[in-house]
Amino acid sequence: MPACHGKRLFRLAGRRCDGVDLMKMPSPNSKLISGAAIMLALWAIFLLSALVISWALDIDSRLSLSGDGARMLKAEAVACSGAEVALHPAVTPGSRNLSGQLDNGASYEARLSGEGGRLNLNWLVAGEDPDRLEILRRFLEVKEIDLHERDTMVDSLLDWVEPNTGLHHLNAPSESDDYHPPHTLLTRIEELKKIAGWSEFTSTPGWEDEFTLNSSGPVDLAWASRDVLLALPGLTPEIVDRFLQARRGPDGIDGTEDDTQIRGIDDAHLLLRLNEEQFKRLNGLISFKDPVLRVVSVGTAGKAKRTVQMVFRRIGAVPQLITWKEF
């Protein structure tokens, strides 16, 4: 048996050689293995922590989205409530019931106005009545659109809505593969964006506010804006401003409690201060208290806001809904 530092080497397990326990002698790679194990453990802890943090952030995001969604639904519901209040036949534009707050903190603010105060485009172009078309031309002039553009816009609109008879209006572009009018009346105000010559006008914010397709037709003197009134024959800025001041009352706002009570077309005639000849020019072009109304109701819940817009016809006790829009 070979010697171990001058002593005999024992092969039995657990025996010592030169005072050293062979079973407890460290392996050359033991420190490397221990270090790797620690690194793996730390890496596992890091990954687990990252997963927990990601999960927590996801839950927080979902809760936040859920809260925002709940507030949006609440705002939409309360906006609908305001619109439904406006449908009641006893509610007038200046009614205090058009604004309110619920127990849950949500609130609504609704505004009721006459649809007839806007220009009904289909009515203006129907049959190419020169007096009606002149209202549209003057309105575009009030909006500071030059003569050449006005001619293009009006002729293109006429081509767009009239039946396809092969005739073509002088200032409208010819039909092509890229431009093909449907030759039917407008169904949505937004169609104007597709009509030649109207792109610049319809890119202006609020351009659609003074147009409609849903009124009875003639301009409603109870609700027409300054620009719409100026488009009527014989109405000068002085006449219009004087009329609006009287119609709106001290606060200068339509649809409030201090508005002048105008009972009919004869009262409107007196407020306009037109002679009989001047007023006769408006015959067939104006009305008073068109039965078609518009309500715009804004619901608020926290920072969330939703708007409901309805156009309806108020005849009798049951309103007839024409359009509904949410945004």
Spell out what each predicted region is.
Residues M1-S34:
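N-terminal leader/signal peptides at the extreme start of proteins
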Residues K24-N29, I33-F327:
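Compositionally biased linear targeting/interaction segments
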